Amino acid sequence: MAMCASPRPFRRVGSAGAAALAAGGAGGAERRGRPAPLQDETLGVASVPSQWRSVQGIRGETKSCQTAGIATAESSAQARTHADAQVQTEAPEEPAAMAPVSQYDTLRLEAFLRRVEAMVIRELNNNWQSHAFDGYEVNWTEQQQTVSCLHTLVYPLAQGQGLHVTGISWNSTGSVLACAYGRLDDGDWSTLKSYVCTWNLDRQGLNPQQPSVVVEVPSAVMCLAFHPTQPSHIAGGLYSGEVLVWDMSRPEDPLLWRTGLTDDTHTDPVYQVLWLPEPRHSHRFQVLSAATDGKVLLWRGSGAGQLRLTKGFALAVQQLPRSTKLKKPPRGETEVGVTSVAFSSFDSSLFVLGTEGGFPLKCSLASEVAALTRMPSSVPLRAPVQFTFSPHGGPVYSVSCSPFHRNLFLSAGTDGHVHLYSMLQAQPLTSLQLSHKYLFAVRWSPVRPLVFAAASGEGDVQLFDLQKSSQKPTVSITQTQDGSPVYCLEFNSQQTQLLAAGDAKGMVKVWQLSTAFTEQGPREVEDLDQLEAEITT
């Protein structure tokens, strides 16, 4: 039987491989029934190239992105119009030739001057004493010839309760007017709620029936006064005897200081409050209060919201000068009620008091005489009275010291008279009957030495110019149409053409004065001195 071997593929091997194959072939017949031993072989290297990069190159896509386009715009600006101008100095002029100095005879000129000297001096003295041009002034501005009402201010809620305007005051800038609401007639005032209101007259769109600030007060307000330098601070005196200070720049919580109900507090209504500089610190101020309990007290604000008593005075009947013949007071009453105060413009310690008994009293803050009183006080009370003047026929509700003369002051009483006094004599220099009813206020003008104003119980404000007449008013202004009393008035020391007056109808009227009452004459102060001298002699 014949066998045919199938062909195997040809493979190149190395020499070692060939030798092994030859040896294996020789003994193959002998070992054909068992496997041959394993041997190492070294094979050729086969490389397979990567297809990934080429595939990614085919499949990949290139993308790009950016933010949205930024919109920009350009513009230019310049003045709407322009103008060009050229300037230069004027063409110089040739100076005129200096005239030759004339020749004169020195001896003859000297003789002439000696001869006329006495005559020229005599004429100059005559001109100095002449009154030919008194009152002549150049009018640079238009003259206001009438007195007109600029504003009629009223708080409807207070007016609806029948409250009176008991006090008014201008602030230190002259732009804000404050008024106190209370009562000055019969009635139970102890539980009467009242108000303090302010109006800024310089504010645009002024509403005369809507105050800028309203402060509600639990007791009737009898008087008030703005701080001399702090435009928003107001001191007020109440019917209950308390003294309060408000800061009107804090309308939500305006109360700054108060005396509280202590042994130092007044026991009767406070009729006047004033601000006084402290003796050693002129930029600091304290509050002075005067009441019908006979006490004049000085208060200083503390950090605890309290007014602390620093000094006090009491008016005891037995300590008044002997020239004062007061009616015998009721049993147990030894104090003289105070109704008004005015300080001298020339001596900060000198002041005048108006009293319920009708006597104006000259007083001093420097007094060290102990007051004979049993009223309780945390500080020693002094007796301030130095001199007593002849009385009115009733209580003196207002006194005013002249800002131009150290010795003159005015007083107004319920007898309807205004008295002009000198500090140097008891009798008044002159007495003017201005009303058949009470006079509640009198004030000197801050700019005219011979002008003053008075408020009457017949509803009039009367303006006097003593340069024109010393017996009758120059102008009488009707404040109330029904004759209701005018209780208070104040000149504006900053805007001197303004005069404010408050009345029993609950209204405050601001009057614009004519230039005749606001422009001082060239010799007015001298005329005031002469008036005092003529009346005194």
Curated annotation (Swiss-Prot):
<dbReference type="GO" id="GO:0031965">
    <property type="term" value="C:nuclear membrane"/>
</dbReference>
<dbReference type="GO" id="GO:0060271">
    <property type="term" value="P:cilium assembly"/>
</dbReference>
<dbReference type="GO" id="GO:0005929">
    <property type="term" value="C:cilium"/>
</dbReference>
<dbReference type="GO" id="GO:0005868">
    <property type="term" value="C:cytoplasmic dynein complex"/>
</dbReference>
<dbReference type="GO" id="GO:0036064">
    <property type="term" value="C:ciliary basal body"/>
</dbReference>
<keyword id="KW-0597">Phosphoprotein</keyword>
<dbReference type="InterPro" id="IPR050687">
    <property type="entry name" value="Dynein_IC"/>
</dbReference>
<feature type="region of interest" description="DYNLRB1 binding">
    <location>
        <begin position="107"/>
        <end position="132"/>
    </location>
</feature>
<dbReference type="GO" id="GO:0016604">
    <property type="term" value="C:nuclear body"/>
</dbReference>
<dbReference type="GO" id="GO:0005730">
    <property type="term" value="C:nucleolus"/>
</dbReference>
<keyword id="KW-0966">Cell projection</keyword>
<dbReference type="GO" id="GO:0005930">
    <property type="term" value="C:axoneme"/>
</dbReference>
<dbReference type="InterPro" id="IPR015943">
    <property type="entry name" value="WD40/YVTN_repeat-like_dom_sf"/>
</dbReference>
<dbReference type="GO" id="GO:0005829">
    <property type="term" value="C:cytosol"/>
</dbReference>
<keyword id="KW-0853">WD repeat</keyword>
<feature type="region of interest" description="DYNLL2 binding">
    <location>
        <begin position="80"/>
        <end position="93"/>
    </location>
</feature>
<protein>
    <recommendedName>
        <fullName>Cytoplasmic dynein 2 intermediate chain 2</fullName>
    </recommendedName>
</protein>
<dbReference type="GO" id="GO:0005813">
    <property type="term" value="C:centrosome"/>
</dbReference>
<feature type="repeat" description="WD 1">
    <location>
        <begin position="216"/>
        <end position="256"/>
    </location>
</feature>
<comment type="function">
    <text>Acts as one of several non-catalytic accessory components of the cytoplasmic dynein 2 complex (dynein-2 complex), a motor protein complex that drives the movement of cargos along microtubules within cilia and flagella in concert with the intraflagellar transport (IFT) system. DYNC2I2 plays a major role in retrograde ciliary protein trafficking and in ciliogenesis. Required also to maintain a functional transition zone.</text>
</comment>
<feature type="repeat" description="WD 5">
    <location>
        <begin position="481"/>
        <end position="521"/>
    </location>
</feature>
<comment type="similarity">
    <text>Belongs to the dynein light intermediate chain family.</text>
</comment>
<comment type="function">
    <text>Acts as a negative regulator of the Toll-like and IL-1R receptor signaling pathways. Inhibits the MAP3K7-induced NF-kappa-B activation pathway. Inhibits MAP3K7 phosphorylation at 'Thr-184' and 'Thr-187' upon Il-1 beta stimulation.</text>
</comment>
<keyword id="KW-0206">Cytoskeleton</keyword>
<keyword id="KW-0677">Repeat</keyword>
<feature type="repeat" description="WD 2">
    <location>
        <begin position="265"/>
        <end position="309"/>
    </location>
</feature>
<dbReference type="GO" id="GO:0005814">
    <property type="term" value="C:centriole"/>
</dbReference>
<feature type="repeat" description="WD 3">
    <location>
        <begin position="391"/>
        <end position="431"/>
    </location>
</feature>
<comment type="subunit">
    <text>The cytoplasmic dynein 2 complex consists of two catalytic heavy chains (HCs) and a number of non-catalytic subunits presented by intermediate chains (ICs), light intermediate chains (LICs) and light chains (LCs). Among them, a heavy chain (DYNC2H1), two intermediate chains (DYNC2I2 and DYNC2I1), a light intermediate chain (DYNC2LI1), and a light chain (DYNLT2B) are unique to the cytoplasmic dynein complex 2, but a subset of the light chains are also shared by dynein-1 and dynein-2 complexes.</text>
</comment>
<dbReference type="GO" id="GO:0030175">
    <property type="term" value="C:filopodium"/>
</dbReference>
<dbReference type="InterPro" id="IPR036322">
    <property type="entry name" value="WD40_repeat_dom_sf"/>
</dbReference>
<dbReference type="GO" id="GO:0035721">
    <property type="term" value="P:intraciliary retrograde transport"/>
</dbReference>
<feature type="modified residue" description="Phosphoserine">
    <location>
        <position position="15"/>
    </location>
</feature>
<keyword id="KW-0963">Cytoplasm</keyword>
<dbReference type="InterPro" id="IPR001680">
    <property type="entry name" value="WD40_rpt"/>
</dbReference>
<dbReference type="GO" id="GO:0045503">
    <property type="term" value="F:dynein light chain binding"/>
</dbReference>
<dbReference type="Pfam" id="PF00400">
    <property type="entry name" value="WD40"/>
</dbReference>
<feature type="repeat" description="WD 4">
    <location>
        <begin position="434"/>
        <end position="474"/>
    </location>
</feature>
